[in-house]
Amino acid sequence: MKETLDQLMQSALAEIAGAASEDALQELRVRYLGKKGELTAVMKGLGSLSPEERPRMGQMVNTVKDRLETTLEETLQRVRAAAKKERLERERLDVTLPGRTSPLGTKHPISLVIEEISDIFAGLGFQVAEGPEVELDFYNFEALNFPKDHPARDMQDTFFVDDDILLRTHTSPVQVRTMLKHAPPVRIISPGTVYRCDSDATHSPMFHQIEGFMVDKGVTFGDLKGILTNFVNQFFGAGTGVRLRPSFFPFTEPSAEVDIACVMCKGQGCRVCKQSGWLEILGAGMIDPEVYRHVGYDPESISGFAFGMGIERVAMLKYGIGDLRLFFDNDVRFLQQFR
C-alpha cells in the first residue's frame, strides 16, 4: 500500500503542476480527493490491514492528503494570479493617451433663425411673449375678426380638439392675450409652434411662426414699412430690395404681402422666384379696429400694426434649403452644417 500511495502522490503532483486553469484543478481535486476519488479509495482499504499496520498507513494517507490539498490550493492561487495579470494586461489603459472628444451637437436651424429674428426685433424695442399651443376659438379666430364662415375655421384647415378648442393656426392669439393684459404702448413678437392640415415639400402640419405687433398713439403704415425694411436688411443683408403688395387679412386693414428681392438671383428672375425677381416672406397690415374692440382698446385714440412670418419659410430662403421636410428628418449630416 505504501508503494501505491507514493505512486498516487507523485502522479497527482505531476498533474497538478501541469494544470493551467481553475477548471482543470477542480477536476483533479475531484479525481483524487472526491468521495469517489483515488485517495478516498485507498482510505477505504485501511480496514483490511492488520491492527499493527493500520495506524502507520493511516498517518501516511493523511500526509498525502494534506500534501495534495496544500499543493492544489497553492497552484490555484498561482493560476488565478496569472489569469488576473493576463486580463489586466489585455485591458490595460494608457492614461497618457489624449482623450477622445465627444461630438458636440449644434443648434437646430429653426432655433438659430428664431434667435436671430428675436435679437433683431429686440434691438427695435420689441419684447418676446408666448402663449398656449392648444387655444380657444375666441383667441385664435373670433377676437381676430375671423367670421364664422371663414375657410380657416373649416376642419380641413384647422385641427379641432373640441367645438371651441383647437391647435392654434398662427401665433396671433398671443397678440390678443397681450392686449387684454396690457394697456398701450406695446411692442411684442411671439415665436412659436403652429398647426394646420397641410403637408408636402413646402408645407408641414406643424411649423413655426413669428407674430409681431406694435400699438401706440400715432403708429402709421410708414412705421410698419420702416421696421420691416430694417428687419429684412439685417436678416437677408444690407440693400435687399423690399416691396409691399396689397392683400387681405381679417385682422388687419389695410393689409399687405411683403416681398424681398429673390435671394437666389438677386432680383434678376429665376426658377425659384418664377422669373418675377421677388419672393414673398410675410404678411402684414394695420390692426383692424374690430380687434381693438375685442380687447377693450379705443381705436379712435391708438393705432398699430401686426405682421407674421413662417420661420421655415425665411430659413429656407436664408440658407438655400429646397425641401421643408429636411427640418424635421433629424439627419445629422444636414443639421451639422449649421454651426
Curated annotation (Swiss-Prot):
Q: Which reaction does it catalyse?
A: tRNA(Phe) + L-phenylalanine + ATP = L-phenylalanyl-tRNA(Phe) + AMP + diphosphate + H(+)
Enzyme Commission code(s) on record: 6.1.1.20
Cofactors: Mg(2+)
Q: Which InterPro entries match?
A: aa-tRNA-synth_II, aa-tRNA-synth_II/BPL/LPL, Phe-tRNA-synth_IIc_asu, Phe-tRNA_ligase_II_N, Phe_tRNA_ligase_alpha1_bac, Phenylalanyl-tRNA_Synthase, tRNA-bd_arm
Which family is this protein grouped under? Belongs to the class-II aminoacyl-tRNA synthetase family. Phe-tRNA synthetase alpha subunit type 1 subfamily.
Quaternary context: Tetramer of two alpha and two beta subunits.
Question: What protein am I looking at?
Answer: Phenylalanine--tRNA ligase alpha subunit
